């Protein structure tokens, strides 16, 4: 309770703090003058003191009260006024967004940019009747007027990225003229034109994003120019035609259009509208004003399979599932049909169909079957009943799911803890594809609610494979899933968390407890994901344990009976095919949680005793973790040792065999030093004797051996005179034998021409006989054989030729065929005589023994018989004609002959033709009946149907239609539709259309409602529901009269507010983009690379969204290798010099002018050291010869001539003072300016004489004075002045510098400065004064170093050229003494060294002011310093007088801290350095003080 009151009290304090804020005085007076001028007393009442509490009414900065955000002002005058808003009325306010309502507007306000910090201007004023000039360069410009008419030139909108022009008078309008030059058409992105009279031609506008076009009621359909729609090349095109005009639905669009919205009253199409060629269109929205845009109750368009369809307020009677009569939809489409009269029951799904349907606001009835589970179905506000399927019920605790089904009468639509017993996701990990696959039952489609643990993460959202049943998640390649055993997924709906295995692993228990009542509790991993997909069984000993609950990490089960407690019992857990065994103690309450080493390696090697953590190894395995293999003979027969790694004996040198039980003796080695000469020879290590292979012989098998063949008499080479060579293995036979084994006798065959068997046969030397080749004969194979050796006994074979000579009665090559002659050997020249039979073979057109008679085939009937067979049908095959009997007809006699009805002996009564095939009459057009004796009259035909079809009937004797109850007319072609309730007496019924024509004051289908007008007639932004008097706004239109425009993201990314005048987001400071999702990026520091090229580091603010990032250095691209929210790393090629740097992302460019400076490999020295030193080109610094000093060695180093200096700090002014002799030098921080990118001064803070001393520190080492002053309520500037007590080295921005004793070091801190605009930058001014004190020296009149009255010599080239050795010098030579002002060209920006610039601002006869251009950073440190040295022209002796030299060292460090808030802008120009032309500075000589004074003293002026 106390916390509650404290919280309320805190809110009270905040509320009062907000109410107490007031704008700065100048802004307060500015707004007060406007309120007074226009008498805005209602919105801005005075308070009790007579003043105004502006910040309680308008948007003020919560810190300093500045009106630098959104300002909306509305006239309160109800009568015409002549008081006009002019630019100077409000140019004194720093708002960035201005909205003016109902004022009389000066035209100069339209064409001149008075409000420099403003990027968005909206004006609603009927005083604007035309736009005749180029509008002022506000990026977003809105003009609303009821009197804006005529032709508006697009060339007047070239300065706008977003333009909204509205004529809110529905009886008039305007047109657009495309007259802008091509280069001026690029900037416009979001045009919004309302009140158009025709479709504009936007040819050449290539940057369009989301244009919208609202057409006036006054348009003429004939001049609408619908063809111009194809010139609108935009991401999304929106066209809203008035409800008062009927137009043709446009059919031609630009190919680049991805999203199309079109609203209107469209004529009823007569054919399907084919838009399928516009394949780039991803979504088309059709918003109807009436019910005519359909074909037979279906959507009348055909789209590509990638186009989503949104159709509303039409008349669609058929519930489309897989498509329409004109097109089949694909799974890639989404279908939305709202408030269009869909009715009937929702059918179950089948086939390939879209996965998204929105049927909201229709009249669909029936139940929702589970076939819809794999779709995203929305049926809000229908008439459905019954129960929702489980796939939906499981996720009703998600309001996004539940609202899809509200407005029906589902009995189980429970949103709080809905019952869910079927939820069962299933996971598979595919490591090869680095993919997690999710399948299962009723796990839903709300993928953003599926959260993986930190072990894994999806690179993107879950990817749909099959909607509602199969999804995949690709995890990053950096994730080593091999090292991950399992992971969990939290399913937001229905609110369950499950752990899934990443690998296949046996159950792994780590704790097992047997409890009372025979209960068993097991903890560990890899048991089960959940019920449904894993079969488990558990037993302890021989007792089964019935599973009660099971999860990935635990199991509870109940034993069927009490287990034995005498000894450990074996626990067996079986999960599918994976088995885990362990021995446990079954003593009640004992925790078996002792894990064995390496889990006993595997279940096949050993089992863990979890009561004591020891392994029981299975047979064949040994070791603490059973990882070793036991040898078959454990002691290896005392002839060796067992190697348990491989389970084999390692024998000693005198034993062998697997168990080392056999002795070992070495066999002799061959000439090749191999035992038994190697090869296939073997050694008997028990006897030491070689056994040679079949190819070797000898004691060591070194001699080759080849066995000769053995003959049939079992003798080598068959014995006898034959011999064997067992080196080669070849027999040598004697002259009477042959063969490889010399076993065969040798006998010569008959010879011809000394050739055995005449060369035509094979000689058998065993018998001496020839075997002749085919075709040869005789003993020596010299003769030829006939085909038949004896010519079949009907002839004689001539072996010299191999040909049969046949006897006269026979023929053929082998004389086997008798020879017979025909009766007419010529066969009448109509055939061929066959001598084998003596019969003529006639051709197809003749017949007879001699082929002299013609032959013609008669037709064959369908029964495959000639003349169809039958006894009465006869074929004449000389003529080929059938003669049919009396009951048949036709060429093949295959058709029956039937007589027709006859009247007066005349078939068909003479009024028709007889078909003797069917026996029926075909009456002429004027007769009917079987015999054509009845007259026929035709009834009227419509729609190609007699009497229009349906249940209408025709009397063909009279030709008159009889209509059913639903039709009327001579041809029944008119529908008969009675009106409901006869129009309630408030109108006239048309019973052809069943439509009531209501009297003037009534409306509705049955004239049942009175007409109620809507506010402002819905301002052309919506349709008036005249029943309720409430506007139904068009998409993206809002407010009760639809006068407002809804932003694409109404929440503006939670970083802005939506301006309903133009539908554009007004982003908070620090954000930008159409939806305010991008940060206003900038760079605060750059670490460059050498001229050879390399890695560049850029630090700043870049946000989490980095779309299409690009870095340019000068004209070179810097290839990005890494980008984070606050840094960019990129690689660039070689270059040189100072370059602009630009960072582009999310479509916006930021530019840092002269922010990048290539690092030189060799540095040049200033003035080449004036020949008084050597240039160190690595550092760009002079190493002066003895006697010289200074940055360019142009000064003398004699310090014995120098009078000591006296440093001081003025505690009232915070000025640093150094006095030396009669000269006094002051160092002051005088001004801080906020400047625009065009160098204009927006704000200036005069710092002089406003410092407050905070603290003085004075000890042995330090003497520091601390000051500060407030810049605004939220920002301040502080300064520390330190008097240096001893020489020391200062390290700054990676460089080292020496600062001398008696110097003054100045540190400046600017914190929490809030910029008016991100285009702006800060410039800090430091001023140095040189004076003569009132004291003079008697030596002065003799000092030859005093000037002669001429001007001082000034050299500021280094300051204007920052590309030399990181040091910029301003050199002032006076009295032969040199004042060196050193400005380092680097700054420590948020802890990082980066390049900056400094420049001369102003000079006069005794002072110089230097400006430091500060980077955009939270903390910046800048370190200039000053010193006075001797010129080389300095004279040590002037006659009789001594000269004096003055050295004034000053060091200044500046820091900027805190948060600087940026205002959104299209392009950032960050002012890092301003390089001016060489400034010729001439300081007038210091006036010589001739007044007398005490010698040697210094006084403070």
UniProtKB/Swiss-Prot annotation:
Q: Which Gene3D superfamilies does its entry note?
A: Laminin
Q: Which residues lie on this side of the membrane: Extracellular?
A: 21-1446
Residues covered by the EGF-like domain: 627-661, 782-816, 818-852, 896-933, 975-1008, 1043-1077, 1161-1194
- What are the record's GO terms for cellular component? membrane
Where in or outside the cell it occurs: the entry states: Membrane
Q: What induces it?
A: Down-regulated by Pseudomonas aeruginosa, PAO1 strain and up-regulated by PA14 strain infection.
Q: What is its main location?
A: membrane
Q: Which InterPro entries match?
A: B-sand_ComC_1st (IPR057014), B-sand_ComC_2nd (IPR057015), ComC_SSD (IPR054484), EGF-like_comC (IPR053331), EGF-like_dom (IPR000742), EGF_extracell (IPR013111), IPT_dom (IPR002909), LRR_ComC (IPR057013)
Membrane-crossing ranges are 1447-1467
Q: Cytoplasmic face: residue ranges? A: 1468-1501
- In the record, which residues are listed under signal peptide? 1-20
The effect of disrupting this gene, in the record's words, is: Cells are unable to sporulate when in pure population although they will sporulate when in chimerae with wild-type cells. Cells form loose aggregate before disaggregating. Cells aggregate and disaggregate in waves. comC-/lagC-/tgrD1-mutant fails to form spores.
Q: Which Pfam families match?
A: Beta-sand_ComC_1st (PF24142), Beta-sand_ComC_2nd (PF24143), ComC_SSD (PF22933), EGF_2 (PF07974), EGF_TEN (PF25024), LRR_ComC (PF24141), TIG (PF01833)
Q: What are the glycosylated positions?
A: 47, 64, 169, 192, 255, 315, 397, 453, 470, 497, 612, 635, 643, 685, 693, 700, 726, 765, 835, 843, 877, 916, 956, 991, 1017, 1122, 1270, 1309, 1334, 1437
Disulfide bridge positions per record? 631-642, 636-649, 651-660, 786-797, 791-804, 806-815, 822-833, 827-840, 842-851, 900-914, 908-921, 923-932, 979-989, 983-996, 998-1007, 1047-1058, 1052-1065, 1067-1076, 1165-1175, 1169-1182, 1184-1193
Q: Which keywords are on file for this protein?
A: Developmental protein, Disulfide bond, EGF-like domain, Glycoprotein, Membrane, Repeat, Signal, Transmembrane, Transmembrane helix
Q: How does it sit in the membrane?
A: Single-pass type I membrane protein
Matching PROSITE patterns: EGF_1, EGF_2, EGF_3
**What is the documented function of this protein?**
Regulates aggregation via a pathway that involves lagC and tgrD1/lagD. Inhibits lagC and activates lagD expression.
What's this protein's name? EGF-like domain-containing protein comC
Encoding gene, per UniProt annotation? comC
């Amino acid at each position: 309770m106390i916390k509650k009151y404290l919280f309320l009290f805190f809110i009270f304090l905040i509320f009062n703090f907000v109410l107490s804020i007031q704008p700065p005085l100048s802004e307060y007076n500015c707004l007060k003058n406007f309120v007074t001028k226009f008498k805005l007393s209602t919105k801005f009442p005075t308070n009790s003191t007579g003043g105004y509490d502006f910040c309680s009414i308008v948007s003020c900065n919560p810190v300093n009260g500045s009106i630098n955000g959104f300002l909306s002002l509305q006239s309160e005058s109800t009568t015409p006024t002549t008081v006009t808003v002019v630019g100077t009325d409000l140019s004194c306010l720093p708002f960035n967004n201005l909205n003016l309502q109902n004022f009389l507007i000066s035209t100069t306000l339209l064409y001149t940019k008075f409000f420099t910090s403003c990027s968005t201007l909206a004006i609603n004023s009927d005083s604007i009747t035309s736009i005749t000039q180029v509008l002022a360069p506000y990026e977003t410009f809105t003009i609303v007027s009821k009197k804006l008419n005529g032709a508006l030139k697009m060339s007047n909108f070239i300065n706008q990225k977003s333009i909204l022009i509205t004529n809110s008078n529905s009886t008039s309008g305007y047109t657009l003229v495309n007259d802008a030059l091509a280069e001026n058409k690029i900037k416009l992105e979001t045009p919004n034109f309302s009140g158009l009279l025709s479709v504009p031609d936007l040819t050449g506008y290539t940057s369009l994003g989301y244009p919208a076009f609202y057409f006036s009621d006054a348009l003429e359909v004939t001049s609408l120019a619908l063809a111009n729609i194809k010139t609108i090349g935009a991401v999304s095109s929106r066209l809203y035609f008035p409800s008062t005009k009927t137009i043709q639905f446009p059919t031609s669009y630009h190919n680049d259009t991805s999203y199309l919205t079109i609203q209107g009253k469209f004529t009823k199409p007569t054919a399907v509208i084919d838009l399928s060629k516009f394949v780039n269109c991803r979504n088309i929205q059709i918003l109807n004003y009436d019910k005519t845009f359909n074909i037979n109750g279906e959507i009348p368009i055909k789209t590509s399979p990638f186009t989503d369809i949104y159709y509303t307020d039409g008349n669609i009677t058929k519930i489309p599932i897989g498509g329409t009569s004109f097109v089949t939809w694909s799974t890639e489409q989404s279908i939305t049909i709202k408030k269009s009269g869909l009715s009937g029951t929702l059918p179950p799904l089948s086939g390939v169909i879209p996965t998204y349907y929105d049927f909201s606001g229709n009249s669909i009835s029936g139940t929702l079957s589970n076939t819809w589970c794999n779709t995203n179905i929305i049926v809000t506000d229908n008439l459905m009943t019954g129960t929702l399927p489980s796939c939906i019920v499981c996720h009703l605790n998600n309001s996004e799911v539940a609202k899809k089904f509200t407005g029906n009468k589902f009995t189980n639509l429970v949103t709080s803890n809905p019952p869910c017993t079927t939820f069962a996701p299933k996971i598979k990990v595919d490591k090869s594809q680095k993919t997690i696959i999710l399948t299962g039952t009723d796990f839903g489609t709300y993928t953003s609610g599926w959260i993986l643990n930190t072990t894994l993460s999806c690179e993107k959202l879950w990817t749909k494979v099959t909607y509602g049943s199969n999804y995949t998640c690709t995890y990053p390649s950096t994730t080593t899933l091999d090292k991950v055993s399992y992971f969990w997924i939290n399913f937001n709906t229905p609110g369950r968390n499950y752990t899934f295995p990443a690998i296949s692993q046996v159950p792994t228990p780590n704790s097992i407890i047997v409890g009372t009542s025979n209960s068993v509790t097991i903890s560990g991993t890899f048991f089960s994901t959940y019920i449904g997909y894993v079969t488990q069984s558990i037993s302890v000993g021989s007792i089964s344990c019935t599973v009660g609950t099971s999860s990935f990490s635990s199991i509870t089960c109940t034993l069927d009976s009490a287990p034995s407690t005498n000894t450990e019992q074996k626990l067996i857990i079986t999960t599918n095919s994976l088995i885990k065994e362990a021995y446990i103690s079954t003593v009640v309450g004992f925790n078996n949680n002792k894990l064995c080493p390496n889990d006993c390696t595997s279940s096949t090697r050993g089992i863990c005793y979890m009561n004591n953590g020891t392994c029981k190894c299975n047979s064949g395995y040994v070791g603490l973790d059973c990882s070793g293999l036991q040898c078959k003979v454990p002691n290896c027969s005392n002839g060796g040792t067992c190697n348990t790694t491989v389970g084999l004996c390692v024998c000693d040198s005198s034993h062998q065999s697997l168990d080392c039980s056999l002795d070992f003796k070495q066999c002799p080695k061959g000439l090749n030093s191999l035992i038994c000469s190697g090869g296939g020879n073997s050694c008997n290590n028990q006897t030491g004797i070689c056994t040679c292979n079949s190819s070797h012989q000898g004691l060591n098998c070194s001699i080759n051996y080849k066995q000769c063949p053995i003959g049939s008499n079992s003798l080598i080479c068959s014995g006898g005179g034959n011999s064997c060579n067992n080196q080669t293995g070849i027999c040598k036979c004697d002259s009477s034998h042959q063969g490889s084994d010399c076993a065969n006798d040798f006998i010569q065959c008959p010879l011809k021409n000394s050739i055995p068997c005449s060369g035509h046969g094979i000689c058998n030397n065993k018998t001496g006989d020839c075997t002749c080749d085919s075709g040869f004969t005789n003993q020596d194979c010299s003769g030829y054989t006939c085909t038949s050796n004896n010519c079949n006994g009907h002839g004689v074979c001539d072996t010299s030729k191999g040909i049969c000579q046949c006897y006269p009665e026979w023929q053929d090559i082998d004389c086997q065929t008798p020879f017979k002659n025909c009766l007419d050997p010529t066969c009448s020249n109509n055939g061929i005589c066959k001598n084998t039979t003596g019969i003529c073979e006639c051709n197809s057109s003749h017949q007879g023994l001699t082929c002299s008679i013609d032959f013609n085939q008669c037709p064959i009937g369908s029964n495959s018989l000639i003349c169809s067979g039958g006894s009465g049908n006869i074929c004449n095959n000389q003529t080929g004609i059938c003669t049919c009997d009396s009951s048949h007809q036709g060429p093949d006699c295959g058709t029956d002959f039937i007589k027709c009805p006859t009247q007066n002996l005349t078939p068909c009564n003479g009024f028709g033709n007889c078909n003797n095939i069917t026996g029926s009459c075909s009456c002429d057009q004027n007769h009917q009946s079987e015999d054509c004796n009845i007259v026929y009259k035709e009834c009227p035909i419509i729609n190609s149907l007699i009497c229009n079809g349906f249940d209408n009937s025709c009397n063909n004797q009279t030709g008159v239609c009889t209509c059913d109850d639903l039709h009327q007319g001579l041809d029944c072609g008119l529908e008969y539709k009675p009106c409901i309730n006869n129009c309630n007496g408030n109108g006239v019924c048309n019973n052809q259309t069943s439509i009531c024509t209501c009297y003037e004051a009534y409306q509705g289908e049955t004239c049942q409602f009175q007409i109620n007008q809507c506010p402002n007639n819905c301002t052309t932004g919506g349709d008036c529901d005249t029943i309720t008097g409430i506007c139904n706004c068009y998409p993206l239109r809002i407010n009760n009269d639809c006068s407002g425009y809804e932003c694409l993201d109404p929440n503006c990314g939670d970083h802005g507010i939506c301006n309903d005048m133009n539908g554009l987001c007004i982003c908070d400071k620090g954000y930008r983009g159409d939806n305010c999702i991008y940060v206003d990026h900038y760079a605060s520091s750059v670490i460059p690379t050498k001229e050879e090229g390399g890695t560049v580091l850029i630090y700043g603010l870049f946000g989490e969204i980095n779309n299409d990032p690009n870095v340019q250095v000068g004209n070179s691209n810097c290839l990005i290798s890494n980008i984070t929210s606050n840094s960019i790393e990129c690689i660039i090629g070689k270059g040189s010099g100072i370059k602009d740097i630009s960072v582009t992302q999310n479509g916006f460019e930021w530019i840092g002018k002269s922010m990048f400076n290539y690092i030189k490999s060799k540095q040049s020295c200033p003035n080449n050291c004036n020949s008084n030193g050597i240039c160190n080109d690595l550092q760009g610094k002079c190493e002066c010869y003895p006697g010289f000093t200074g940055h360019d060695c142009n000064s003398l180093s004699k310090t014995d001539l120098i009078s000591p200096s006296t440093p001081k700090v003025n505690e009232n002014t915070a000025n640093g003072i150094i006095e030396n002799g009669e000269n006094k030098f002051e160092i002051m921080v005088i001004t801080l300016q906020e400047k625009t990118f065009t160098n204009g001064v927006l704000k200036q803070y005069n710092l002089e004489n406003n410092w407050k001393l905070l603290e003085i520190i004075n000890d042995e080492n330090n003497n520091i004075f601390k000051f500060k002053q407030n810049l605004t309520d939220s920002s301040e500037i502080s300064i520390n002045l330190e008097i240096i007590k001893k020489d020391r080295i200062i390290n700054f921005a990676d460089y080292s510098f020496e600062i001398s004793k008696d110097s003054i070091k100045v540190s400046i801190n600017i914190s929490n400065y809030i910029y008016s605009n991100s285009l702006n930058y800060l410039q800090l001014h430091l001023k140095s004064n040189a004076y003569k004190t009132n004291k003079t020296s008697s030596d002065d009149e003799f000092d030859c170093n005093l000037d002669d009255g001429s001007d001082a010599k000034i050299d500021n080239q280094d300051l204007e050229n920052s590309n030399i050795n990181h040091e910029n010098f301003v050199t002032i030579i006076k009295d032969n003494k040199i004042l060196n002002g050193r400005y380092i060209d680097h700054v420590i920006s948020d802890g990082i060294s980066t390049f900056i610039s400094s420049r001369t601002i102003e000079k006069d006869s005794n002072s110089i002011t230097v400006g430091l251009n500060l980077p955009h950073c939270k903390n910046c440190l800048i370190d200039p310093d000053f010193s006075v040295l001797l010129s080389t022209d300095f004279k040590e002796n002037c006659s009789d007088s001594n000269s004096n030299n003055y050295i004034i060292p000053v060091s200044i460090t500046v820091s900027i801290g805190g948060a600087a808030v940026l205002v959104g802008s299209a392009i950032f120009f960050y002012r890092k350095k301003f390089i001016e032309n060489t400034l010729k500075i001439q300081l007038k000589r210091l006036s010589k003080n001739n007044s007398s004074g005490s010698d040697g003293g210094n006084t403070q002026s």
